[in-house]
A protein has these predicted regions:
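Generic recognition of flexible, low-complexity loop/linker segments
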Residues: 7-9, 51-52, 67-69, 154-156, ...
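Bilobed periplasmic-binding protein-like "clamshell/Venus-flytrap" ligand-binding domains
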Residues: 167-185
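Amphipathic alpha-helical protein-protein interaction surfaces
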Residues: 46-49, 111, 166
Length: 188
């Protein structure tokens, strides 16, 4: 696992810090299963980071995360889990520590209540999306160009996810990912 940290300073009228932490993985293969697990991982991390960074540490007004897996028509595939946080400069160290600590914790344990909430949301969003032309147009194009079927097994995969599935995914994902940290701090 490689890690790159780009911390830089910028003169600002209103001092603030921004952190973007991204874990890239091009070794784990693209699949509907991995794409769903990456999405769920990002949503769980968003919930955790909001609670720990915003509510408990008061280190940021907002914070979020997202996970995606994508494949292009030339066969290139990549996963990305990203945490982003406009953070209070004086609390950047604690915020960044929470980001790292909590993704590591997720690789060993996942709260079932969070997973249940996200599963219900994903299934509802899926049903809503299937009522739009854009959804079906994108599905046909992805199937034609790349041979992907992100529709048929979606509900089944989402419904059957367990906390252990998410933790194993995160553990496997992190073991072969590269981490990039981009941190902007105010210049005195």
């Amino acid at each position: 696992q490689k890690s790159v940290n780009n911390t830089f300073y910028r003169k600002m009228e209103t001092p603030k810090a921004n952190a973007i932490i991204s874990w890239f993985n091009h070794k784990m293969p693209y699949s509907v299963d991995n794409a769903i697990k990456a999405d769920v991982t990002g949503q769980i991390l968003s919930m955790i980071y909001l609670k720990k960074i915003r509510e408990e540490a008061s280190a940021a007004y907002t914070v979020g995360a997202q996970g995606v897996f994508s494949k292009s028509d030339d066969g290139f595939q990549i996963g990305q889990i990203v945490a982003y946080c406009p953070i209070k400069p004086e609390k950047k160290d604690i915020g960044l520590k929470i980001i790292d600590d909590e993704i590591a914790k997720l690789s060993t344990t996942c709260e079932s209540e969070m997973l249940d909430k996200i599963q219900k949301l994903l299934l509802k969003q899926f049903d809503d999306r299937t009522k739009t032309n854009g959804y079906w147009s994108s599905l046909v194009m992805n199937n034609y160009v790349m041979g992907l079927d992100n529709h048929t097994a979606y509900k089944d995969v989402v419904s059957k996810l367990t906390p252990m599935d998410i933790s194993k995914f995160v553990k496997d994902y992190l073991s072969s990912s590269n981490k990039v940290s981009i941190i902007m701090l105010p210049k005195e």
